[in-house]
From Swiss-Prot:
It comes from Saccharomyces cerevisiae (strain ATCC 204508 / S288c). The chain crosses the membrane at residues 59-81. This is Uncharacterized protein YMR030W-A. Keywords: Glycoprotein, Membrane, Transmembrane, Transmembrane helix. It is a single-pass membrane protein. Glycans are attached at residue 4. It comes from the Eukaryota. It is found in: Membrane. GO terms for cellular component: membrane.
Length: 96
């Protein structure tokens, strides 16, 4: 299923992303000038994501605190908001 990612900012650049959650529990997302990928744990929680810029520069980040839960519903997209902090990318899931 697809998970819609509205947009996020990295260094004042705006990216629009669309996630594809595959059966092997990986998250793939195509962005304007790079690639965002990650993994989902058994309970549908994101454990680690990485952003790969077009210049082959990788930014890894882990979501700590209360780990964000993805509730997978067949055919229903999830709009997401994300902002880039100093060392982390903060994601807000708006579950429909």
């Amino acid at each position: 299923m697809y998970i819609n990612f509205t947009s996020f900012l990295i260094k004042e650049k705006k990216y629009n992303v669309r996630f594809l959650l595959s059966r092997n529990r990986k998250i793939y997302a195509a962005v304007g000038e790079g690639h965002l990928s990650g993994f989902v744990t058994k309970n549908h929680k994101i454990s680690r994501l990485s952003f790969i810029f077009s210049k082959k520069k990788k930014v890894f980040f882990t979501i700590f605190d209360t780990i964000i839960t993805i509730i997978v519903r067949s055919g229903i997209p999830f709009p997401l908001l994300c902002s880039f902090g100093r060392n982390k990318i903060y994601i807000l899931f708006n579950v429909l």
